[in-house]
Amino acid sequence: MRLLGIETSCDETAAAVIEYNNESSSRILSNIVWSQIDHHAPYGGVVPEIAARAHVEILDHLILQALTEANTKLKDIDGIAATSGPGLIGGLLVGVMSAKALSLATGKPFIAVNHLEGHALTAVLTHNVKFPYLLLLVSGGHTQTILVHGVGNYQRLGTTIDDALGEAFDKTAKLLGLPYPGGPALEKAALLGDKNRIPLPRPLKGEKRLDFSFSGLKTAVRQAATAIAPLTENDVADIAASFQAAVTDTVRDRVHLALQHFTHQYPLSHDQEKHSPALVVAGGVAANQALRSTLQELAHQHGFEFIAPPLSLCTDNAAMIAFAGAQKLAQGETSSLDIAPRSRWPLDEKAIPLIGMGRRGTKA
């Protein structure tokens, strides 16, 4: 079957068509992404109203382009999947209403997809990874370790108690005067810097809880930058390198605990005669090469296979939404046209909050 996917949760407008036969033989027929970076760069961050208006202006064109590249007519589509949360509500409304309109016009089912579930299942699309696996989701709005037991079955182990990792990258880059988007700019600057020059904290390192924290690290960077201002290019590079080293050390420590938790919960998954368990990284920050290298080394130390989707599927895209929607549709799951988009929508929505586990993230 063929699914049309629509993604409008933040500052990328995207449409895609996939062909789904089963989990191990699905193909991306088209995957169109239009970035709004130029719209938001003058403001140093995403402006929600500008983002929503940009989605309105371009989405219809992208849907047509996705269908054309997939050599597929709308009447041949078996279902229409759209990101329905979490995210910026204005953008979500654009995508959801467009998907509902197409569903009404064609009589094809509408499938509301959790944006986080799209990221969580991308590795199944790209690498045919087997359930269960451990997911590290790192983006501008989320930093979570999640046990993926199966489609629709997720167990959050840890989350950020303050800022998401992508947000920390962007705000640190802005503090250093680096261009928007800040994450890639900071990573590039760090290549030229001395990571040992600026002593920075590793928040929560050594603690048994599985949560993350990055606000204190941001504050330490601000204090260091203020102490040596005005900043030279070398200063900026050294601070960027020191920040990135602190981040990778912190993430390594947190994921180390999550891998131990996984091994305790699934001891038989280490039976090498079957297959190695997998550590999957997803989300926009997963494009950071220093983070990838650190996680790959850590995974191998624990006997895990390390899986990172292609860079084009780490950032927001509609192929992952179409694939998640296809898996739901294959299980007979569709959504009512009365469903409303949600700015907050945790993957483990039915889980009982645990004391000391922190809040559920800025968008979850």
Swiss-Prot record:
Family: Belongs to the KAE1 / TsaD family.
Reaction(s) the record says it catalyses: L-threonylcarbamoyladenylate + adenosine(37) in tRNA = N(6)-L-threonylcarbamoyladenosine(37) in tRNA + AMP + H(+)
EC class: transferase
Keyword Iron part of the UniProt annotation: yes
One function term, GO molecular function aspect: iron ion binding
Listed GO CC annotations: cytoplasm
Record's cofactor remark: Binds 1 Fe(2+) ion per subunit.
Annotated protein name in UniProt: tRNA N6-adenosine threonylcarbamoyltransferase
A Pfam family assignment: TsaD
Keywords associated with the record: Acyltransferase, Cytoplasm, Iron, Metal-binding, Transferase, tRNA processing
Cofactor(s) required, per the database record: Fe(2+)
Gene that this sequence comes from: tsaD
Major location category of this protein: cytoplasm
Enzyme Commission no: 2.3.1.234
Residue numbers binding Fe cation: 115, 119, 316
Gene Ontology biological process terms, A to Z: tRNA threonylcarbamoyladenosine modification
InterPro entries xref list: ATPase_NBD (IPR043129), Gcp-like_dom (IPR000905), KAE1/TsaD (IPR017861), TsaD (IPR022450)
Chain residues that bind substrate: 137-141, 170, 183, 288
Compartment(s) of residence: Cytoplasm
Matching HAMAP family: TsaD (MF_01445)
Annotated organism of origin: Bartonella tribocorum (strain CIP 105476 / IBS 506)
Superkingdom of source: Bacteria
Transmembrane segments: none
Function per UniProt: Required for the formation of a threonylcarbamoyl group on adenosine at position 37 (t(6)A37) in tRNAs that read codons beginning with adenine. Is involved in the transfer of the threonylcarbamoyl moiety of threonylcarbamoyl-AMP (TC-AMP) to the N6 group of A37, together with TsaE and TsaB. TsaD likely plays a direct catalytic role in this reaction.
